[in-house]
Regions:
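Ligand-binding clefts of soluble mixed alpha/beta catalytic domains
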Residues: 1-132
Length: 132
């Protein structure tokens, strides 16, 4: 549906606008950062803002994780003929994707700078801007 509605075209406008930002910016993810939407909000790269952090509730991925599993593991899922085993495999793969997409994992792999306590958000933003 989103392809028929031209979502990517509209999202490209956000990407271009974000990439043209010349002032320093800080990105704080409260919940989910998936696909082009996340990229648009950080100027095209998680490394473009002067500081990128997430609350512990943050989730990250190149696209929605359920869809990513269906596309990325299509052969494995189609090869399983037993419906119950197929569902179990799918659920296991989705769970693994959620584990890999947690904010703490993104920070551990240097995709973001830190996972912060939500109550420290204002202090973290001010420190990042002052440090610029």
């Amino acid at each position: 549906d989103s392809e028929l509605e031209g979502s990517v075209r509209r999202m490209a406008t956000l990407l271009v606008s974000g990439a043209k930002i010349t002032s320093p910016h800080v990105a704080i993810f409260l919940r989910k950062g998936y696909g082009l939407g996340a990229q648009a909000m950080v100027g095209g790269s998680f490394h473009d803002p002067i500081y990128t952090a997430s609350w512990p509730t943050g989730e990250f991925g190149g696209m929605g994780l359920e869809g990513a599993v269906k596309l990325g593991f299509r052969k494995e899922l189609e090869a399983e003929t037993d419906p119950k085993k197929k569902e179990d495999l799918y659920n296991k793969l989705v769970e693994r994707s959620y584990e890999k997409g947690k904010a703490i994992e993104a920070a551990a792999h240097l995709e973001i700078d830190a996972v912060i306590d939500p109550s420290d958000t204002r202090k973290v933003i001010l420190a990042a801007v002052k440090g610029f």
